[in-house]
Amino acid sequence: MIRLKFLVQQFSNKMKKIIFVSFFLVLCSFASADSKMGLGLEVYNNKAQCGVCHTLQAAGSVGDIGPNLDQMNFQMSQIIYAVTNGIGVMPPWEGILSYEEIEAVAYYVFQSTNK
């Protein structure tokens, strides 16, 4: 009986550790996503000033030169490509924005338009 209590206690302690680590990892992933959204919004509104040309309700922009991003359904890879290389009259941002900034603004637009 004592052996059984010991095994249950050991199992319980291991489960507590697993649950704690799992919770911590989930919490970190939310923090990472929030920081990427924050950087993406900063790049969209300030550094690249995407809203001058594009409408995106989440960013409060009402540009009418480029496509209304709220009406588009892009994949992340398409957004990264367009921001990096430019498309039509949109200039390329490679060399002006870091890859981290390009990825963040793409993530921001993707998350804001794919709900």
Predicted regions and their residues:
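Disordered, low-complexity tails and leader-like regions
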Residues: 1-7, 45-50, 69-70
